[in-house]
């Protein structure tokens, strides 16, 4: 259903209270459950910060994506053209990763990337489970001067579902 502000003010009993204390007492008496994502919404509204969806959208707007089929074809031809960087946690990486991928968890990226990948001109392809964390990782790499970083579209989940090979351990 839908409504407009005028109708709500006229008809909604919760909006009939003009005294702040009465309104608070009435709302507390209803004992309503807190809305989902209330903490994030409050933090965002109070600080002016971005939401997770906003961070992902900003990152996706400035990161190129590599299609799963393009990477699979390049790997089959023996030349990925990228340094593959799997940013998932160790247990996920060990359970199955794209052959040849280096492992650097997203939580350690900023601290360890320069030691692991000293060439800022390298073409780096970040990989995660669903394609979201790898997007953030690629954006971070670009912020750190790795200007050719990209993200695998769809992640390992899509790779697995397509029946493409994964290496263990």
Positions of the model-derived regions?
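Short loop/helix-cap segments at secondary-structure boundaries that form the rim of catalytic
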Residues: 93-99, 159
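Active-site neighborhoods of enzymes that stabilize oxyanions during catalysis
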Residues: 163-169
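Accessory terminal helices/loops
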Residues: 1-65
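Catalytic cysteine-centered active loop of the rhodanese-like fold, especially the PTP/DSP P-loop
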Residues: 104-161
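Short hydrophobic beta-strand that contains or immediately precedes a catalytic carboxylate
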Residues: 71, 83-88, 104
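Conserved beta-strand scaffold positions in the cores of enzyme catalytic domains, especially
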Residues: 65, 84, 101-103, 149-151
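Short glycine-rich anion-binding loops that position phosphate/pyrophosphate groups of nucleotides
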Residues: 89-91, 130
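A short, well-structured juxtamembrane/interface segment
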Residues: 60-77
């Amino acid at each position: 259903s839908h409504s407009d502000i005028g109708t709500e003010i006229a008809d909604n009993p919760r909006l009939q209270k003009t005294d702040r204390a009465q309104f608070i007492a009435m709302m507390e008496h209803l004992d309503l459950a807190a809305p989902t994502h209330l903490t994030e919404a409050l933090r965002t509204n109070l600080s002016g910060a971005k939401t997770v969806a906003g961070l992902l959208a900003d990152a996706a707007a400035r990161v190129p994506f590599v299609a799963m089929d393009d990477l699979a074809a390049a790997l089959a031809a023996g030349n990925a053209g990228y340094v593959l960087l799997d940013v998932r946690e160790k247990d996920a990486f060990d359970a199955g990763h794209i052959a040849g991928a280096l492992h650097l968890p997203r939580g350690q990226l900023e601290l360890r990337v320069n030691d692991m990948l000293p060439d800022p001109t390298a073409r780096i392809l970040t990989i995660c489970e669903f394609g979201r964390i790898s997007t953030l990782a690629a954006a971070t790499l670009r912020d750190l001067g790795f200007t050719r970083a990209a993200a695998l579209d769809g992640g390992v989940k899509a790779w697995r579902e397509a029946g493409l090979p994964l290496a263990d351990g």
